[in-house]
């Protein structure tokens, strides 16, 4: 007999793949059950609805993203390298965690209360991570910032603005080059000194 928590995790992982393939609207409980080789009733035992499963998938992917970004922040003491890696890992993670990305940025799913809460939670988390990186860099003398909170908000806003062009044009070789160029402008500016 399988452990309840492990079965919940199996449901979440299987559902994640199906939601990312077909989207929330086109995914059915039948497809989720079929992918697990179980009956729908066994899934309804753990989750009351497709919406509840989707919420669990979004929470799961949010935790994956947070873990990956936390690992980047702890990976080195060099704040410039941390910020560079943070931006790249963030963008690559969004591509892998398509359900989370769609939930956070799609207007079609805005009618779910949990989506709006997740959006706000994500924005706060990201601004805090960036603020910490900038604070660490300012404290160590790597960065010259008067207001790390405002700078974090600006970087966060710039990153959000990059998402659409980067993900719509699925040319991954260019993504790295474009991200490096943007990060270099962030670090070195465009004004001659």
Language model feature labels by segment:
Residues 7-15, 32, 57-61, 65, ...:
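Generic hydrophobic, amphipathic alpha-helix propensity
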Residues 102-106, 116, 120, 138-184:
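Hydrophobic/aromatic-rich alpha-helical bundle segments in the mid-to-C-terminal region
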Residues 10, 18-52, 56:
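Helix-turn-helix
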Residues 50, 57, 61-65, 86-90, ...:
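Hydrophobic/aromatic residues within well-ordered alpha-helical segments
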Residues 56, 67-96, 152-155:
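Hydrophobic alpha-helical connector segments
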Residues 1-6:
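N-terminal intrinsically disordered/low-complexity leader segments
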Residues 21-25, 76, 97, 140-141:
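Short coil/turn segments at alpha/beta junctions that flank glycine-rich nucleotide-binding fingerprints
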């Amino acid at each position: 007999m399988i452990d309840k928590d492990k079965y919940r995790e199996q449901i979440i992982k299987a559902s994640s793949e199906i939601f990312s393939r077909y989207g929330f609207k086109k995914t059915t409980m039948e497809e989720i059950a079929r992918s697990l080789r179980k009956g729908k009733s066994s899934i309804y035992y753990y989750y009351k609805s497709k919406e509840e499963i989707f919420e669990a998938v979004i929470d799961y992917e949010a935790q994956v993203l947070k873990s990956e970004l936390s690992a980047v922040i702890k990976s080195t003491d060099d704040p410039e390298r941390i910020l560079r890696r943070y931006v790249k890992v963030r963008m690559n993670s969004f591509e892998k965690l398509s359900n989370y990305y769609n939930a956070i940025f799609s207007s079609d799913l805005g009618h779910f209360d949990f989506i709006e809460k997740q959006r706000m939670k994500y924005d706060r988390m990201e601004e805090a991570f960036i603020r910490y990186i900038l604070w660490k860099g300012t404290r160590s003398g790597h960065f010259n910032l008067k207001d790390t909170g405002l700078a974090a908000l600006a970087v966060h806003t710039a990153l959000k603005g990059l998402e659409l062009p980067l993900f719509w044009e699925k040319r991954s070789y260019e993504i790295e080059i474009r991200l490096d160029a943007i990060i270099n402008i962030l670090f070195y500016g465009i004004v001659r000194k």
